[in-house]
């Protein structure tokens, strides 16, 4: 977010020279264009909703509700953060489905979709305002829930601090919370959980 276009271009060039893909988060349109101008021979892809820049194509098409991760948002204003999490997981080869606009202001919307969450191994819940969605969700489902406070809101909710404090003070045991607007961090937490599950399955099979 605070790196210059020149610094980002240098990092991408070093990754390219090593044959490694790269994902850069918190990149706006102007900076993405500036980086692309500095690297004319690179096939960079800017993902405007997620505000990310990748050195390889990343597709989010065709993801269904059977994906191992489901990302929920309280409202459509949370979409950029949810998309950042979804893209970060896709970059790692993990499919994540989106379930938007299921905030606690209309709790019936979440309750009627609970059956769709059964196949997910990890849930990421993005919410602004008072940030209640992750707490409510963690009280309803057995899967790991990762809460992402979002900076949308007004009054005392402005900036996401109220949502962060609410999630940290949650009475739902085991709720994981990342920093404000940190969709990428939530994705990496989900990836670690999935990696542990996979390693345990492999270990168990090895013992057989």
Give the residues covered by each predicted segment.
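Short, acidic/small-residue loops that bind anionic groups at enzyme active sites
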Residues: 45-47, 137-160, 208
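Glycine-rich phosphate-binding loop
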Residues: 112-150
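Long amphipathic alpha-helical segments
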Residues: 1-45
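C-terminal binding/interaction regions
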Residues: 73, 114, 118, 122, ...
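Glycine-rich oxoanion-binding loops at beta->alpha junctions
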Residues: 52-54, 95-116, 160-162, 178
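Short glycine/serine/threonine-rich phosphate/pyrophosphate-binding segments
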Residues: 8, 78-83, 107-108, 127-137, ...
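Short glycine-rich or small-residue beta-strand-to-loop segments that form or flank ligand, phosphate
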Residues: 22-23, 68-74, 97, 123-125, ...
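Glycine-rich phosphate/diphosphate-binding loop of Rossmann-like nucleotide-binding domains
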Residues: 64-109
């Amino acid at each position: 977010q605070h790196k210059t276009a020149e610094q980002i271009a240098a990092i991408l060039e070093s990754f390219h020279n090593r044959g490694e893909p790269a994902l850069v988060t918190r990149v706006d349109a102007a900076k993405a264009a500036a980086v692309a101008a500095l690297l004319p021979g690179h096939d960079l892809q800017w993902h405007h909703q997620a505000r990310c820049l990748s050195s390889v194509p990343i597709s989010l098409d065709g993801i269904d509700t059977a994906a191992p991760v489901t990302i929920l948002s309280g409202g459509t204003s949370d979409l950029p953060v949810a998309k950042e999490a979804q893209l970060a997981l896709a970059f790692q080869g993990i499919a994540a489905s989106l379930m938007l606009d299921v905030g606690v202001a209309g709790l019936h919307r979440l309750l009627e979709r609970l059956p769709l969450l059964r196949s997910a191994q990890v849930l990421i819940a993005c919410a602004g305002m008072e940030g209640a969605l992750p707490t409510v969700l963690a009280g309803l489902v057995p899967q790991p829930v990762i809460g992402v406070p979002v900076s949308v809101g007004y009054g005392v909710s402005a900036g996401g601090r109220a949502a962060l404090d609410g999630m940290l003070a949650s009475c739902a045991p085991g709720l994981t919370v990342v920093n404000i607007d940190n969709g990428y961090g939530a994705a990496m937490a989900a990836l670690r959980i999935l990696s542990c599950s996979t390693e345990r399955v492999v270990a168990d099979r090895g013992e057989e």
